[in-house]
Design a protein with these regions (language model features):
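ABC ATPase NBD coupling module
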Residues: 77, 89-110, 133-134, 152-158, ...
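ABC-type ATPase nucleotide-binding domains, specifically the catalytic core motifs of the NBD
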Residues: 37, 117-138, 146-151, 155
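ABC-family P-loop ATPase nucleotide-binding domain
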Residues: 1-33
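Helix-to-loop junction immediately C-terminal to a conserved catalytic motif
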Residues: 73
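ATP-binding/catalytic-site motifs of ATP-hydrolyzing domains
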Residues: 82-84, 88
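ABC ATPase nucleotide-binding domain signature
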Residues: 108-112, 117, 147, 165
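Conserved beta-strand
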Residues: 29-32, 40-53, 81
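The feature captures the beta-strand-to-loop junction immediately N-terminal to the Walker
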Residues: 58-60
């Protein structure tokens, strides 16, 4: 933990970031220049995140937080650099290929569910972007088994889960 506090108070450089995630790096972003259209937003951005490490992107509006995430998921133009998950380069993969290849997907900030479908049906909807939709049943079941709160509500309409979750 002490090395985390050493980088506070200054803009960390790549070597500082590597000390925060010395073991089993899961996400690597190296020398990333990315943006929208011809406008470059990120300049030589670097990030290293270990497995089981939490990360919080903090900064003012326009600092590039969303652009970092959009770049990981393939929603920006990548002018230079690379993005890797577990050592596999994903920079040029489409969002669907990223989901299939390394299991990452972009979930919108709002409650992006179908409220009149069950929790399980909402999970199954994600399977339609896969090549083999029959795999979606297995994947949904894994999620329902892993997260008791969802599993216990698998046949409940999602709108009721949202009401409970959001406290409405």
């Amino acid at each position: 933990m002490s090395n985390q506090y050493e980088v506070l108070g200054k803009a960390p450089v790549a070597e500082d970031l590597k000390t925060l995630s010395p073991n089993d790096v899961h996400l690597t972003i190296k020398n990333l220049n990315a943006g929208y259209g011809k406008m470059e937003i990120l300049h030589n951005f670097e990030l290293f995140v270990s497995k089981a490490q939490s990360l919080c992107l903090i900064g003012p509006n326009g600092a590039g937080k969303s652009t970092i995430l959009h770049s990981i998921y393939g929603f920006t133009n990548i002018f230079n650099g690379k993005i890797e998950i577990d050592g596999k380069e994903i920079t040029k993969l489409s969002p669907a290929e990223k989901l299939k290849s390394v299991g990452i997907a972009y979930i919108l900030q709002d409650n992006s569910v179908f409220p009149d479908m069950t929790v399980e049906e909402n999970l199954l909807m994600g399977g339609f972007i896969k090549d083999k939709t029959e795999d979606s049943f297995e994947e949904a079941e894994k999620i329902l088994q892993k997260y008791d709160r969802l599993g216990n509500r698998r046949n409940q309409l999602a709108k009721f889960y949202l009401v409970e979750k959001e406290g409405y």
